[in-house]
Amino acid sequence: MSHSVPNALMTGADYLDSLRDGRQVYLNGERVADVTRHRAFRNACRSIAGLYDGLHGEQRDVLTRVDAQGRRSHRFFTPAQNAEDLLGAREAIGCWSRMTYGFMGRTPDYKAAFMSGLEAGAGFYGDYRHNACAWHRAFADRGLFLNHAIINPPLDRSKAIHEMRDVFVHVERETDQGIVVSGAKMLATGSAITNATFVAPVASAQMEAGKAEDFAVVFFARMDNPGLRLMCRPSYEERASSPFDYPLSSRFDENDSVLLFDKALIPWEDVLVYRDLRRATGFYAESGFANLYNFQSGIRLGVKLELMIGLLSLGVRANGTQSFRGIQAALGELIALQHLLQALTTAMARDPERNAAGSAVPRLEYANALRIQVPQIWKRVRELLESALGGAPLVTVSGAADLRDGEARRLVDSYYRGAELEPEQRLKLFKLIWDATGSEFGARHAVYESHYSGNAEQIRLDSLAWASRRGHLAYCEAMVQRCMADYDIHGWLRGPWQHD
């Protein structure tokens, strides 16, 4: 029956066409006329387009399902009702992740962690609940590509939010058409090639009643908004000299940008929260976003580690060190880390809880455990590769051109062969390893995996806060009390240890 349901999800061509909307993207002092054709963005756009084409190809039934309303959508774009739905979403997320080898962290399914439950939990948004429903329907039906920008620029953290009106996103005024906002938000990873960006305060934002209401807004910013500009960091894709030299940078660079709103009119239909301190940050807990984005990210990172396992295994074989005991131990540890992620995401799917709207979401305790482990895992992955491979990834030629030049190629063929690989294949392998770990693209991924979920202290403080609210900390303390109640200064008071 599912094969007969119309598929309104975007194709790759639809997605590319949706980006040609006059958005104001700035790079290297110039406005980018068309991100789909500019050499700084075009391959990243094509990578995402490939995901959308997957929704219509051989993997369609892995990636999509028909929901209760008879609409076909990506399996992670609509709320799950049970563990079976979450397991299906897990397969869909993994399928998309393998198309980018886990190296695109903000693919369209990332923001689905929030958007999937927006309609089911629309009541939370009060007067704006109809906007929540409409946005979810458009998101799920078309498979829109959304990102978010929730961080204020770190200019002077000694000041309260309301004291930074000249920089932070805030409401200037309201009109019959909507709200007029100005200010900056970051870090808008990939927003230059998305359909819209979700803008909100960060969950830990401290906003003072009577002073910060203008900052307590949550809305969607369409990328063609005349009052919105994106200032992009340098493009690794643009700098990539060839696919041979930079096989990851050249196609998976999710350009990070800062959103600059200059008296931008946000239509009322795109507003979810307006001057409401409680709702402006309360939606994080209500929506199950923390439960779900960690689920998506953990699955993606597990796929990324599959690639890293293969890179380490082939790399040590090329070096002829695969039989060394320490090398084998490093590879074994890397495999165990990938299995740890797989086990966590399996538990998150098979043992869910219910969010405020009644949908099945991964258990928060498991999501939090993964959230804390991810930065440590990726740091350890890099350490293992650097230790096991040493300087081998640096022993390469300057570029693919050296393999096309007759005299240079003769020298390469003589001196660059590996234990099991011909020179060209050895160089190809180690350039891939370098791009994954040591290039500017690789270094950016080290920063991303360490910080996309929050700073190291905050994620641990969240763990403590959640354990306190949910009673787990009290349960652990009560266990100590039970243990100490077994005995006193005179001996055993109860249990099997008592004896005459």
Curated annotation (Swiss-Prot):
Q: Which GO terms describe its molecular function?
A: oxidoreductase activity, acting on the CH-CH group of donors
- The yes or no answer to whether the keyword Oxidoreductase is present is yes
Alphabetized, the UniProt keywords read:
FAD, Flavoprotein, Oxidoreductase
Q: Which GO terms describe its biological process?
A: pyoverdine biosynthetic process
Q: Which residues form the signal peptide?
A: none
The pathway is: Siderophore biosynthesis; pyoverdin biosynthesis
InterPro entries per UniProt? Acyl-CoA_Oxase/DH_mid-dom_sf, AcylCo_DH-like_C, AcylCoA_DH/oxidase_NM_dom_sf, HpaB/PvcC, HpaB/PvcC/4-BUDH, HpaB/PvcC/4-BUDH_C, HpaB/PvcC/4-BUDH_N
Q: Which Gene3D superfamilies match?
A: 4-hydroxybutyryl-coa dehydratase, domain 1, Butyryl-CoA Dehydrogenase, subunit A, domain 2, Butyryl-CoA Dehydrogenase, subunit A, domain 3
List, separated by semicolons, the cofactors it needs: FAD
Q: Name one Pfam family in it.
A: HpaB_N
Q: What is this protein called?
A: Pyoverdin chromophore biosynthetic protein PvcC
Organism in which the protein naturally occurs: Pseudomonas aeruginosa (strain ATCC 15692 / DSM 22644 / CIP 104116 / JCM 14847 / LMG 12228 / 1C / PRS 101 / PAO1)
